[in-house]
Amino acid sequence: MPSRSKSSQRWLKEHFADPFVKKAQAEGMRSRAAYKLEELLQRDRLLKPGMVVVDLGAAPGGWSQQVRKSMGASGRVVALDILEMPPLAGVEFLHGDFREQAVLSEFEAMLGDVPVDLVLSDMAPNKSGMDAVDQPRMMHLAELAMEFADTHLKVGGAFLIKLFQGVGSDDYIRELRRRYEKVTIRKPAASRKRSAEVYVLGQGKRAQIK
């Protein structure tokens, strides 16, 4: 217990000293994660006016907020989460589990015949602190996100996902290479150096899996 207490104290100290936390508070952004996405969007020029962007596991809304800010008033931002999320201007929110057919049907009804240009996933499980538990949970969420993109992302579209480096992540990236013309691994500046997280970008969705 004492070591956990020290770890918690260290995390809190780092969190409140974090320049991206301070920036998020000053700029009214919902999470520091918005700045990870901002760097990735700019570096790879992922957004164009009028795009349709889907944000999986969107709560508390930092990524959706950043997409809407970056895209201006054009296009559509559709956020999905099993958790509640307070409303965001210019963001359509669907509350539910996208593994359930009823939720998927509602999502498809929201979109109509409009193709999805970009799928985002910053999903992560609640951490137990044990890699043997956390990594399989993370990879399961990543599989669900990839399957969602397989079904709903247009040919030529892009998929950006957070992964934890560890068991299963290399195999997952190989699967992405079968699905996308170009796959890139990124570690944005706002990502804590000690964190095992990386962001993997698939661009140019193939018409068929190789």
Curated annotation (Swiss-Prot):
Biological process terms in GO annotation: RNA methylation
Positions with a binding annotation for S-adenosyl-L-methionine: 61, 63, 81, 97, 122
UniProt keyword list: Cytoplasm, Methyltransferase, rRNA processing, S-adenosyl-L-methionine, Transferase
Reactions this protein catalyses: uridine(2552) in 23S rRNA + S-adenosyl-L-methionine = 2'-O-methyluridine(2552) in 23S rRNA + S-adenosyl-L-homocysteine + H(+)
MF GO annotations: rRNA (uridine-2'-O-)-methyltransferase activity
Record-annotated active site: 162 (proton acceptor)
InterPro entries on file: RNA_methyltr_RlmE, RNA_MeTrfase_FtsJ_dom, rRNA-MeTfrase_E, SAM-dependent_MTases_sf
EC numbers for this chain: 2.1.1.166
Subcellular location: Cytoplasm
GO annotation, cellular component aspect: cytoplasm
Its job: Specifically methylates the uridine in position 2552 of 23S rRNA at the 2'-O position of the ribose in the fully assembled 50S ribosomal subunit.
Family: Belongs to the class I-like SAM-binding methyltransferase superfamily. RNA methyltransferase RlmE family.
Protein name (record): Ribosomal RNA large subunit methyltransferase E
Source organism of the structure: Xanthomonas campestris pv. campestris (strain ATCC 33913 / DSM 3586 / NCPPB 528 / LMG 568 / P 25)
Gene name linked to the record: rlmE
